[in-house]
Amino acid sequence: MSSVFSGDETAPFFGFLGAAAALVFSCMGAAYGTAKSGVGVASMGVMRPELVMKSIVPVVMAGVLGIYGLIIAVIISTGINPKAKPYFLFDGYAHLSSGLACGLAGLAAGMAIGIVGDAGVRANAQQPKLFVGMILILIFAEALALYGLIVGIILSSRAGQSRAD
């Protein structure tokens, strides 16, 4: 009985592990950022309910991090089709590194957004001039996840370049 698989038998494991890592770690960052900044919004909203909608920005920014992981996971999973073309260890490792780059950057950004969002919305309730500063810090934290997304796209595009087609 022969296998129709061409390439390395273990390579798809690493590719799918990369897709899972991208989604899981990014969603962990998104969940942490949403929860941490959501607690800040809820506690601030008790005293200043008129600021709740203005202070929801960190929660939204944290939620976007999960989408970055989803994008990379879809890119990776569509690139794994061993029956259509050979899938070697280089491809699996490229997809694994792509998923880890995006996922761990999303996790770090989510932690930063959560902490800044929590402290920022509470401080904004006491001193409204701090809103612009909070938004700028949140943008820089979100940029960390964007860097991971960009590197993840570049690394996943490297899969398939280990051989001359």
Curated annotation (Swiss-Prot):
Q: Looking at the record's lineage, which domain of life comes first?
A: Eukaryota
Q: What is its main location?
A: membrane
Those parts of the protein on the Cytoplasmic side are 34-55, 118-129
Spans through the membrane = 11-33, 56-76, 96-117, 130-155
Q: Which SUPFAM superfamilies match?
A: F1F0 ATP synthase subunit C
Where in the cell is the protein located? Vacuole membrane
User: Site Essential for proton translocation: which residues?
Assistant: 142
Q: Which residues lie on this side of the membrane: Lumenal?
A: 1-10, 77-95, 156-165
GO molecular-function annotation terms? proton-transporting ATPase activity, rotational mechanism
Tell me the disulfide pairings in this chain.
none
Give the UniProt entry's GO cellular component terms. proton-transporting V-type ATPase, V0 domain; vacuolar membrane
Keywords (alphabetical) are:
Hydrogen ion transport, Ion transport, Membrane, Transmembrane, Transmembrane helix, Transport, Vacuole
**Membrane topology listed for this record:** Multi-pass membrane protein
Recorded hits in InterPro entries, A to Z, give: ATPase_proteolipid_c-like_dom, ATPase_proteolipid_csu, ATPase_proteolipid_su_C_euk, F/V-ATP_Csub_sf
Gene3D superfamilies documented for this protein:
lithium bound rotor ring of v- atpase (1.20.120.610)
Q: Which family does it belong to?
A: Belongs to the V-ATPase proteolipid subunit family.
How does this chain assemble? V-ATPase is a heteromultimeric enzyme composed of a peripheral catalytic V1 complex (main components: subunits A, B, C, D, E, and F) attached to an integral membrane V0 proton pore complex (main component: the proteolipid protein; which is present as a hexamer that forms the proton-conducting pore).
Q: What does this protein do?
A: Proton-conducting pore forming subunit of the membrane integral V0 complex of vacuolar ATPase. V-ATPase is responsible for acidifying a variety of intracellular compartments in eukaryotic cells.
**Name assigned to this protein:** V-type proton ATPase 16 kDa proteolipid subunit
Which species expresses this protein natively? Answer: Avena sativa
